[in-house]
């Protein structure tokens, strides 16, 4: 019984890692490239977190809807672990000099000079225009426990911002590798207690 108790304690006391690079030798090219990325850029660029907002009853180009999405982006950006947010009216990130009015013009006018802006912006809108994607870059390793622990907070921020807006009937989803790792960890923790 004592041996079994020690083994169970070891299961609960162990630190799980969801960073696949932890299992590789430190001198491999993929590990080194991530280290270079982390040194020169925000570590979250390796694997951005995606937020999908689904709503069949809104016009994405309505100024009020755009304002609601801009507020959502500011709310997300105000959290302590977020470095940048990109979405259809800010497809180059929140700090880009290209304003939302220029991006919206690219959707309205067939202008060859605006085509690259339109194409970049369109990557954040589903073909049927019912789903908008926000790309969130964290300022920490997206596979770290700190990043995984942040996912419920991010979900709360998104839901509160949406609920207090004119697009409150929208359905939100948080995706990407960090959110997937959080859900996997949560399921694994629950299953461990059930098994033991």
Predicted regions and their residues:
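Signature of alpha-helical transmembrane segments and their immediate interfacial
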Residues: 1-19, 32
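Structured non-transmembrane domains adjacent to transmembrane bundles in polytopic membrane proteins
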Residues: 18-196
């Amino acid at each position: 019984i004592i041996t079994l108790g020690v083994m169970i304690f070891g299961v609960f006391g162990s630190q799980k890692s969801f960073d696949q690079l932890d299992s590789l030798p430190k001198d491999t090219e993929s590990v080194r490239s991530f280290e270079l990325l982390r040194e020169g850029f925000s570590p979250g660029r390796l694997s951005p977190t995606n937020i999908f907002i689904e709503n069949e009853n809104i016009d994405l180009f309505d100024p009020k809807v755009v304002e609601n999405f801009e507020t959502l982006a500011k709310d997300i950006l105000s959290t302590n672990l977020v470095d940048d947010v990109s979405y259809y009216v800010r497809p180059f990130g929140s700090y880009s000099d290209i304003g939302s009015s220029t991006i919206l013009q690219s959707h309205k006018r067939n202008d060859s000079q605006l085509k690259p802006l339109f194409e970049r912006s369109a990557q954040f809108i589903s073909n049927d225009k019912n789903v908008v994607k926000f790309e969130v870059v964290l300022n920490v390793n997206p596979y770290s426990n700190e990043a995984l622990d942040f996912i419920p907070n991010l979900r709360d921020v998104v839901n509160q911002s949406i609920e207090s807006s004119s697009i409150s009937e929208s359905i939100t989803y948080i995706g990407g590798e960090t959110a997937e790792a959080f859900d996997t960890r949560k399921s694994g923790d629950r299953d461990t207690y059930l098994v033991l």
